[in-house]
Amino acid sequence: MTRFSGRPHGSVTAIPSKSAAHRYMICAALAQGRSVIRGLPGELPDDLTATLDCIRALGAAAVFRDDTLEITGINARPDVLRLDCRDSGATYRLLYPVAPLIGGRAEFMQSPSLAARPMEPVTELLKSKGVAAEKLSVSGSFGPGEFPIRGDVSSQYISGLLLALSLLEGESRIRLTTPLQSKSYVELTRASLSAFGGESQWMGQDTILVKPRRLKAADVTVEGDYTHASLFLAAGAVYGPVTVTGLDPGSIQGDRAMLSILDRMGARVDMGGGSVTVSPGRLRGIDVDVSDTPDLAPAIALAALAAEGSTVVKNGGRLRFKECDRISAIATELKRLGADIDEAPDGFTIRGGGKLHGAACRCHNDHRIAMLLIMTAGLCGGIELNGAECVSKSAPGFFGEYRQLGGSIS
């Protein structure tokens, strides 16, 4: 059991975007020649380590020095690929449709929590194309054509198809059978492919045309991560000014929306010189649709605890299929602290401004839940957590960042 206390304030540097890094690493593995990916953390988070191990298993060569990763595109094509995705949903979903185009048969290993997350839309689609597709194995190639798939379960399905279809000899179309949620992650995949010579374009609201392009080596730099920064920015609104440096103000990351959410809630948001500073204001509850930004739910919850009135987080049903059921976990653990929170099928409502108290809480083996609870410590006089080390999934340096902002760990 680890105790956390303190009211975070000060300055911290954004960690590199995990979402962008996954995509760059896979594009580099699929490209001809030697690519360079700059701006990575000195210690890779668990999820990126999973992707690195998997692209090596696919036949790419990779050398990691300091903050730079050099990747030489896939040469050998093993008959059987064994890909250990650990607990990384991005690794699994991005590589699943790619793997059968690389080797004869791909076998996937994964954590129990990842195994519980849905994959049927992709396996059923590939089966319809003649591929032997099961949740933990896939074999058999497929050709270009039309690929209908739901857009409201996981945007990673669409991103994986974009990567795979770029390798085919002819044009393909991804047709969304339901409205796309988390579109910004699909756009991030399209931008990553473009950096390596790939080409795709929207045809109306529900179809993406993917053109056959031989990916070429590139030299790219990973930008700062708005998802990870969101909790620090929310802490600035709650406790005292927090500055996050290294964030691109023109980023296409969807979680950049945290800035406008905090502004709507009444916090002061200042941008300039590659940094963002958030300072407290008279926070008020608002309604937030997280259909495109579900990973912001923990940061919104933190700000909502200190806001007057009700904050409603809605259209986040996919939060129930993350590393844990995040809606249930947020409601359960914040109630332990005395929060006035109601759980809904697709979100939650927090009536803020009430007095909280310390407690022993569970992290549910979910890095986002652990970080949320740690950042609430200043509102409740301290908190004790079991399993807080799960933050290494996305941010192995998180404890250091927390201490840098004045937090105490014992």
Name the predicted role of every residue range:
Residues 1-410:
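Short, structured segments at the rim of ligand-binding sites
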